[in-house]
Amino acid sequence: MERFVQFLRRGNGLMAASLAAGSCAEEVAKAEGAGCRDDAAALRLKGVAMATILVAGVVGVGLPLAGRKRRALRTDSAAFVAAKAFAAGVILATGFVHMLHDAEHALSSPCLPAHPWRSFPFPGFVAMSAALATLVLDFLATRFYEGKHRAETERVKAAAAAALAASSASDDDITVVTVTEDDNDNKAPLLQPHSHSHSHPHGHGHGHELAQPEGSGGEGEVPAQVRSVVVSQILEMGIVSHSVIIGLSLGVSRSPCTIRPLVAALSFHQFFEGFALGGCIAQAQFKTLSAAIMACFFAITTPAGIAAGAGVASFYNANSPRALVVEGILDSVSAGILIYMSLVDLIAADFLGGKMTGSTRQQVMAYIALFLGALSMSSLAIWA
C-alpha cells in the first residue's frame, strides 16, 4: 500500500512538472499578433466568421440531401462522385497538413517543458492510437447495425411466412359444392373439402412472397446502407471534434490579422466537409428528421465554438501549459480520426470498392478531383 501511494505521488509530481510553464515570451507575443491586437475589430470579424461559416456548412451539408431526387446530384451521378472525391481530399489534407501540424506545434511549444513533450513524438502516437480506436469503433458499429439489419430481415420473413400459412389454412377450410346424378336421375348436392397438396407447387396465386428489406445483401454480406450509416456517424464525430477546437482557437484570438485569413479558409473547409458528410447521410437513407438533426449539429458546431471562445477570450490563456496539452492531444485525436475516415471509409470504399469500375472517364475525373481537393486544402496552410 505504501509503495502504491509513493507511485501515485511520483506520478502526480511528473504530471505537475510536465505542465510547468516554460520560457515562452516569444510565443505569447506571436499569439497576440505581433502588434496587430485590436479587440473591437477582432470581435466584429468573429461575428462575420460565425455567419459565413454557418452558411457554408449549411449549404455544403444541404446540397447532397436536397439533391437526392435531382439527377445531377444523385449519389450515383458522375458530378456527385467527383464532388465527394474532392471533399475526401479536403478531409485528408485537413488531418495530415492542418490538424497534425497544429498538434505538433502545440506539444512542442517552449511554454511546455522539454521532458516529456519533446522527448517523444506524442502527436503521431496519439493520432495513430485514435485511428486504431476508430477502426475498432467502426468494426463494432458495423456489427451492431448488421445484427439489427439481420434481425429485421428475419422478422419480415417470419411475418410473411405466418401470413402465407394463415392464407393456406383458410383455403383448406373451404368446401366446394358439387352436383351428382343418381340412378333415378335425381340431382343431389355433395360436399367435398377443398384441400391443397403441399407436396407440389400451389396452383393459386395468393400474392404472398417472402419479402426482404430494401438493400439487403447476400448471406454474410454487409449491406451498403449499413456501412453508410456507420460511416456517416463516425465521420460526423471526427468532424465535430476538430470543429470545436478550430472554433475555440479562432474565438479566443484577439488579432484581426490572425482571424481574417481564417474566415475564408474555414468557410472553404466547412463547405466541403459538409458536402462529404451530407453525401454519406444521403447514402445512409436516414429519416428526414434524423438527417436534419445531423446536418444542423454539424453546421452549428464551429460557430458555437467561436462564440464560446469569444466569451472566454478575456481570461483564457491559450499558451498556458494545460491549454496547450489539451489542444495538442485533441488535435492529434481529430487528425487520426479524419485520416482514417478519409482513407478507409471515403477514398478506399469509393475508389477500390467497385463503384467506379464502369466508366474510365468517371475514374479519371474522380482521381483528379481527389488530388485537387487535397492540394487546395493543403495550400490554405500558407495563410491559416
UniProtKB/Swiss-Prot annotation:
PANTHER family: PROTEIN ZNTC-RELATED, ZINC/IRON TRANSPORTER. Residues 1-25 form the signal peptide. It comes from Oryza sativa subsp. japonica (Rice). Zinc transporter that may be involved in zinc uptake from the rhizosphere. It is found in: Cell membrane. This is Zinc transporter 7. The keyword Transport applies. Pfam families: Zip (PF02535). It is a multi-pass membrane protein. The chain crosses the membrane at residues 47-67, 80-100, 120-140, 228-248, 262-282, 292-312, 324-344, 364-384. Residues 195-205 have a biased composition (Basic residues).
